Amino acid sequence: MILIMQKKNLWLHLLGLVILTLLSAYAVVKYPINLGLDLKGGVEFLLEPDFSVAIEREYEDLARNLREKLSKFNVLEVYATKEGVIIELLDKKEVENIKKVIQDINPNVIFEEEGDKLVVKFTQKYVEQLKEDIVRQSIEIIRDRIDKLGVTQPVVTRVGKYRILVDLPGFLDVERAKKIIGSTASLELKLVIDVSTDRKELEKKLTPDREILPSRDGREWFLVEKAPVITGQDLKTAYVGVDNLGQPAVNFELKGEAAEKFGKFTEQNIGKRLAIVLDRKVVSAPVIRSKISDRGQITGNFTAQEARDLALILRTGSLPSPLKFLQEKIVGPSLGKDAIEQGIKAGILAIILLAVVLIARYKTAGITANISIFLNVLFLLASMAFLGATLTLPGIAGIILNMGIAVDSNVLIFERVKEELRLGNTVSKAIELGFKRTLSAVWDTHVTLLVASVILFQFGSGPVKGFATTLALGTIASFISNVYYAKVFLDLLNSLKILKI
C-alpha cells in the first residue's frame, strides 16, 4: 500500500514537472527575451548636469524677488552673478534689516559684506540639495523622453553621486538621441527691447535686468528683458502644426493662470516684439498684433522631424540644467550579433562538456543531473522572459556560472548518496538520506549567492546589473531543479530499476 502511494506521488510530481516545463517553454517562445546594448547594438551615454547654470538661475530668481522686496530700502542696485546676488547699498545702517528680509525669502543663505556691497550666497548644504534635486529631475525627464521615443528596454540609471548612464538598445541615430536627451528645452517668452546685427550696439543699452541673446542662425542679436513672461513650466501641451506658409511648426497651449497672465501682457504690449527663446537662442520674434491668451506657435524653419522632436521635448518638460556628454559609445548590430554567437557557442560547449563529465562519472544518475541543469536554464530563461528582464553578455556569463553551481550541487548530493550506499543502506534510503544530509550545505550556497546577487544589482550598474539579474534568477531556478526535481528523477530511475551511480 505504501509502495503504491509512493509511486502515485512520484507520478504526480512528474506531471507537475511536465506542466511547469511546458509553461516555461511557452513563456520563452511567447515573450522573447529583451537583448541588452552589448547584444542588440545601440548607443550609450554618460552624462553629468552642468550645475553652474542651474545655480546661476536660482540666483537670478532670488535677485528678481529681492528687487521688489527691497524697494523700500536705500538700495542702489540688486543683480545676480554666478557667485551670488550683489546688493549695492546706499545706507549701510540698513544692512541688518535687509538681511532679515532676505532670510524670510530664503533662509538657506549666508552673507558677505564687501564695502558698500552685500553679497548673498547659498549655503553649501542648500547647494548640495539643489544638485541632488537636479540629478533626480534630470533622470525622470530623460526617462520620459526616451519612453516617448519607443525604445525597448532603455536603461537610465544613476552612476556615482552626480552622473547618469543612458543605454538605448537598438537605437543607432546618435545625433537625434543626443538632441532629444541633451536639449534643456528651456522655453521662455521675453519682451524684446531692441534688435541689431551688431552686439556692441546693444551692449550700450544693457542693464542688470536685461540680457543679449543670439538668433537661432546667429545673424542677429536681441536685447530682451531677463524676466520671462512665460516659461516651459507654463505649458499645458505642445504638438506639431504648420505656420502660415505651410511649414512645420510647434503649437502650444498654456495652463489657466499662465494664459490669464499672458493675455494681460500681450494686451499691454501690442505693437512690440515678443522673443520666443529656446535653449538661450531666439527662434522667432513676432510682433504682438492683438491680445493672445491660451495658445501660441513656435516657428523657425523646422524640418518635420525637428518639429516632432521639439514638441516631444516640450511635452516632457525642460531639464533643470544643461547636460554634459562625458562619454558616448556606439555598439553596432554586427558587434552585437558576434557577441550573441560567441555566447551561444560558449554555452553549447559548456553544456556538452558538463554532460560528458557527469555521465562518465555518475552513469545514469549523471543523466538526471543533465536534465536538472537543462530545466535550471529553461526556468531561468522563462523567468527573464516573463519579468521582462534584459539579457546582456555578462548575463550569459551568469547563466554559465549557474550551470557550474548546479553541477556542484549535484556532485555534492551524488557523492553523499554513494557514501550512504557504502554504509549498507538501500538505494531508496540512500537517496533519501543523501538529499536530507546535503540540504543545509546546498541551501547555504544558494542563499549566499542570492544575497551577493542582490548586492551587485543594488550597487552595480550596466553590465554588473545584467550579471546580477541572471545570477539571482538562476540561483532560485537552480535550487528548485537540483533539490526537488533531481530527487524526483533519481526516484524514477530507481523505481524503473535502472539507476546506476
Curated annotation (Swiss-Prot):
Keyword Cell inner membrane: yes
Annotated transmembrane regions: 9-29, 339-359, 371-391, 394-414, 447-467, 470-490
GO cellular component: plasma membrane
Cross-referenced Gene3D superfamilies: 3.30.1360.200, 3.30.70.3400, Multidrug efflux transporter AcrB transmembrane domain (1.20.1640.10)
GO-annotated biological processes: intracellular protein transmembrane transport; protein targeting; protein transport; protein transport by the Sec complex
The keyword Cell membrane appears for this protein: yes
Keyword field: Cell inner membrane, Cell membrane, Membrane, Protein transport, Translocation, Transmembrane, Transmembrane helix, Transport
Superkingdom of origin organism: Bacteria
Localisation per UniProt entry: Cell inner membrane
Any GO MF annotation of the entry: protein-transporting ATPase activity
UniProt-listed InterPro entries: SecD, SecD/SecF_arch_bac, SecD/SecF_CS, SecD_1st, SecD_SecF_C, SecD_SecF_C_bact, SecDF_P1_head
Pfam families, sorted: Sec_GG, SecD_1st, SecD_SecF_C, SecDF_P1_head
Membrane-topology annotation of the record: Multi-pass membrane protein
Quaternary state and interactors: Forms a complex with SecF. Part of the essential Sec protein translocation apparatus which comprises SecA, SecYEG and auxiliary proteins SecDF. Other proteins may also be involved.
Family: Belongs to the SecD/SecF family. SecD subfamily.
Cited PANTHER family: PROTEIN TRANSLOCASE SUBUNIT SECD, PROTEIN-EXPORT MEMBRANE PROTEIN SEC
Physiological role: Part of the Sec protein translocase complex. Interacts with the SecYEG preprotein conducting channel. SecDF uses the proton motive force (PMF) to complete protein translocation after the ATP-dependent function of SecA.
Name of the protein described by the UniProt record: Protein translocase subunit SecD
Species, as recorded: Aquifex aeolicus (strain VF5)
Gene responsible for this protein: secD
